[in-house]
Amino acid sequence: MKLPGQEDFEGSDAHENVCSEQLDGDLGPGSGLDGPSDIDNGKAQGCKDPLLFIQLNELLGWPQALEWRETGRWLLFEEKLDIGAGRWSAPHVPTLALPSLQKLRGLLAEGIVLLDCPARSLLELVEQVVRVESLSPELRGQLQALLLQRPQHHIQTTGIRPCRRSNAFRKASRDEDTLLKHQNPLRQKLPPGAEAAAVLAGELGFLEQPLAAFVRLQNPVVLEPLTEVVLPSRFFCLLLGPSTLGRSYHETGRAAAVLLSDPQFQWSVRRASNLHDLLAALDAFLQEVTALPPGRWDRTARIPPPKCLPSQHKRFPSKLQEVTSLSRQSAALAENKHHHGPHTPIPELQRTGRLFGGLVQDVRRKACWYPSDFLDALHPQCFSAVLYIYLATVTNAITFGGLLGDATEGAQGVLESFLGTAVAGATFCLMAGQPLTILSSTGPVLVFERLLFSFSRDYSLDYLPFRLWVGIWVATFCLALVATEASLLVRYFTRFTEEGFCALISLIFIYDAVGKMLNLIRAYPIQRPGSPAYSCFCQYPGTGGNASEFDSTMFKDTEDVLNVHPGLVNASFLPPSECIRQGGYPRGPSCHTVPDIAFFSLLLFFTSFLCAIALKHVKNSRLFPSVVRKVFSDFSSVLAILLGCGLDAFLGLATPKLLVPTEFKPTLPGRGWLVSPFGANPWWLSVAAALPALLLSILIFMDQQITAVILNRAEYRLQKGAGFHLDLFCVAVLMLFTSALGLPWYVSATVISLAHMDSLRRESKACVPGEDPNFLGIREQRLTGLVVFILTGVSIFLAPVLKFIPMPVLYGIFLYMGVAALSSMQFMKRVQLLLMPRKHQPDVLLLRHVPLIRVHLFTAIQLACLGLLWVIKSTPAAIVFPLMLLGLVAVRKALEWIFSPQELLWLDELMPEEEKTIPENRPEPEHLFSGNDSENSELMYQPKAPEINISVN
């Protein structure tokens, strides 16, 4: 059966609703004709059908006082009016009885169907509808007056508004109703260009036979009394009939509203030219209806909106799909940055064949965006991002500065860490190709610094001059990589390599946070009763007594202690201050120890960690208004830190606080800011430094480019492009600068950079009921990172304020950053499958296409690689750590001998050579761990913001 509009689709207006910019664009899965999942982005609706708001008005009160009352409404899902509670139900999937659909088809087949009706007002529309020969003029007048009667809407506001009102009160409050319609919260959720459809259903005693009418207006007209939201109406459906048992016309009206809310039926009925087309669209809907057995479910149950639905595009006519496919291909060619083909690399990774050609292309590509990189930062969300990332950066600078000071025996310290972070980070944000990247000291680079210092100490070398030559060689090697466009190799960095490296970084964050807390507990030990190591005695001058005599004495209270004769008094009964007041001397290791610091530090540690997690996830909860939830989510880390600081200030315990250097001078006494090229080292060492520099260059390249690949994934919908060559060039220049000043080496920090992007997510404001906010992309700009690093530089002068921040609170934020990044990885979800019995495993797409044993094998290989990386990092063999990172790519290449390309497509990503073995029309497994109810449910119905994580789902 042909659907309406299919036979004339190739006509002049064939592309009226198939606009390539809207079919694909930058909306990702669910865009175009895949349904109304992209309606909330606020873009123009001229190239696709507008969103339809459907309202069901039911005729109630027969035979005493007839009135139209709103009982249901539809956008994407159904909302019923709970009359007893006086409120709208939660959006849910509508369920229909098959007899109601069959009855609706019969009514439409025998009723009035007006397509492209020229009516311009409700009166003209009603006059055409009531022109029924079977009705007498008197009944026509009664029916016309009834249809023109103002319906009673249920508009929820913050105030108390009764559902039922007297006629006199209704007349006096019409102006109030009009005002309420304009203030209706639902109106704020509708995108521009939305239209309305009114369905009127009910029973009339004076009718002898059913009266049905379906009207499609030629031009949308505002039929203001009919709908609660003032919108131009496109469709009008009337279903009236004689009184019957039950509420059959109520269900028939619901069936009509559900039909109009269906994307395929709506598309067809907008193009229908006669009754046959209308009935064909209804029959096509009936062919896809799924029936549930009556004894196996509760008909009153309300099914919540699903997270995933099948692609609506597959439900449209084949001819439309062909045109849509062509439109998608042309849009992909126009914007191949977001939707490039399987064999075509993105523009940033296309070889130019010229020396420094990739760098020149990056500079040209980013130059046109430079003014907007600052103007786009004028948003309150950027203020939250600055606070969050500033505290994370300061904490990172202090932590790695302290670790670097210990590793180099004071050759570098916290001050160098602050200065290097500020200068290198600010310079990178101003000049880099991807300014959202946050430069910082990283665990792998710190390991290399420790090994380099140990080598210098063992062979009596001057460390900083030797380090300078290593930095010069690293900068030279990196510039050579930029000149030869070696960044194109990032195409071989698949999810396997990214997850292995980034899981290691996340584990380093978690390990350092927990390790710092354990060191703090050792510094402030927990006092256990009866332990001699924590005893404290008060010794009076000139009196005898010993500890053993005191320990054998039992005391009931403090007065017994004060009356004892021996010269030693246990300070657990007598405070040191009381001992000194009475002329004694406190003696013992714990006399000046506050016993509550260790436990209180643990409390602050877990409070900040759990609070940050809870506030971050409150956005998806049902608590508080949406604006409050968004503020809590955006400022989650800042609020967690403030809560920890407030709790610490309230109790007033002497917990360790943030230490910020107050003097601007090198940590190592006697050295200036510029490092001498040779010092006490022989001249040939400048050449020998090339060997460790080669290993460090591999580490810098891998660390920088893996982070860049993750940040520039297409799922994040970045509009301004990447800059792989330009970023590596900036890192090379900064490597030379920091080496000359004796500052730490800096490279892209994966976890903090992802946290930076997480704090700059953009989501749609207009969200219809039942729909989650639509992820729109990242707020791309340079100002947040620049301000963060400027504040880091002036933090030396903010010491009076920063000194009140407890270190356990910052350790908790570190733990949160590591856990959040690790837990959101696809790798961790597959690890959970290892520990999950088969019957409890979720129904995910990955397990539908790959055998479970193969999934476990792939996960086990990843775990083995991660464990090997951790062991090498923690042993003296860490000097080969950069080679092991490069070895991840080799391991991934070797997996081609174990797994088929189809399995690797679902488990990982394909390398350039592997893509040639897969058809171009292959399925794209973008949501491997989304629980779908259909084999075709591979596209998200509503593309949500991807969690800013190590590996994007």
From Swiss-Prot:
Molecular-function annotations in GO: chloride:bicarbonate antiporter activity; sodium,bicarbonate:chloride antiporter activity; sodium:bicarbonate symporter activity
Compositionally biased spans, kind Basic and acidic residues: 916-927
Taxonomic placement: Eukaryota, Metazoa, Chordata, Craniata, Vertebrata
Record key words, sorted: Anion exchange, Antiport, Cell membrane, Glycoprotein, Ion transport, Membrane, Transmembrane, Transmembrane helix, Transport
GO process terms (BP): bicarbonate transport; monoatomic anion transport; regulation of intracellular pH; saliva secretion; sodium ion transmembrane transport; transmembrane transport
Similarity comment: family membership: Belongs to the anion exchanger (TC 2.A.31) family.
Transmembrane segments: 385-405, 413-433, 470-490, 501-521, 594-614, 635-655, 682-702, 728-748, 785-805, 807-827, 869-889
Full protein name: Anion exchange protein 4
Assigned GO CC terms: apical part of cell; basolateral plasma membrane; membrane; plasma membrane
Activity regulation behaviour: 4,4'-diisothiocyanatodihydrostilbene-2,2'- disulfonic acid (H2DIDS) potently inhibits chloride/hydrogencarbonate antiporter activity with 50% inhibition at about 5 uM. Completely inhibits chloride/hydrogencarbonate antiporter activity at 200 uM of 4,4'-diisothiocyano-trans-stilbene-2,2'-disulfonic acid (DIDS).
Domain of life: Eukaryota
Places the protein is found: Basolateral cell membrane
Recorded name of the encoding gene: Slc4a9
Function: Electroneutral Cl(-)/HCO3(-) antiporter that favors chloride ion entry and efflux of hydrogencarbonate and sodium ion across the basolateral membrane and may participate in salivary secretion. Also mediates Cl(-)/HCO3(-) exchange activity in the presence of K(+) as well as Cs(+), Li(+), and Rb(+). Does not contribute to Cl(-)/HCO3(-) exchanger in the apical membrane of the upper villous epithelium.
Region Disordered: start-end pairs: 20-41, 916-938
Sites where a glycan is attached: 546, 570, 932, 949
